[in-house]
Amino acid sequence: MNKNHLSKRVRLLKINEFFFVFQKPQRIKVHSMTLFSRSNKLNFPRIGLAISKKYIKHSHERNRIKRHVRETFRTHKHNLLSLDFILTVHSKQILSLTNNNLIEELKKLWYHYQNYQQKS
């Protein structure tokens, strides 16, 4: 297996893991996306995605967004705190972003948590 893949242990997969984050989250909003986070008792960050058909009708667009979220998370996870993250989309405006712009917006989200880590 490729060592650069995103393993199952760093993904939120069960409904109770999502509910845990949504109970008392910290929130950050950037260009039609919201990143919810909550600390976990593990020694690594985890990511969950909640991207609904309500805002993004076509599956290929949802998959494009998910692919970029997972990839940017994978490249930044070593610098992040032990938090559970859930990314949601709250506007159709995200469809107007090019791949490069989307990646830049996602990097801003992860950068915030890298700064947050250094301040703590």
Curated annotation (Swiss-Prot):
It catalyses: Endonucleolytic cleavage of RNA, removing 5'-extranucleotides from tRNA precursor. SUPFAM superfamilies: Ribosomal protein S5 domain 2-like (SSF54211). The gene is rnpA. It comes from the Bacteria. It is an enzyme of class 3 (hydrolase). RNaseP catalyzes the removal of the 5'-leader sequence from pre-tRNA to produce the mature 5'-terminus. It can also cleave other RNA substrates such as 4.5S RNA. The protein component plays an auxiliary but essential role in vivo by binding to the 5'-leader sequence and broadening the substrate specificity of the ribozyme. Gene3D superfamilies: 3.30.230.10. NCBIfam families: rnpA (TIGR00188). This is Ribonuclease P protein component. Consists of a catalytic RNA component (M1 or rnpB) and a protein subunit. GO terms for molecular function: 3'-tRNA processing endoribonuclease activity; ribonuclease P activity; tRNA binding. Belongs to the RnpA family. It comes from Blochmanniella floridana. Its EC number is 3.1.26.5. GO terms for cellular component: ribonuclease P complex. InterPro entries: Ribosomal_Su5_D2-typ_SF (IPR020568), Ribsml_uS5_D2-typ_fold_subgr (IPR014721), RNase_P (IPR000100). GO terms for biological process: tRNA 5'-leader removal. Keywords: Endonuclease, Hydrolase, Nuclease, RNA-binding, tRNA processing.
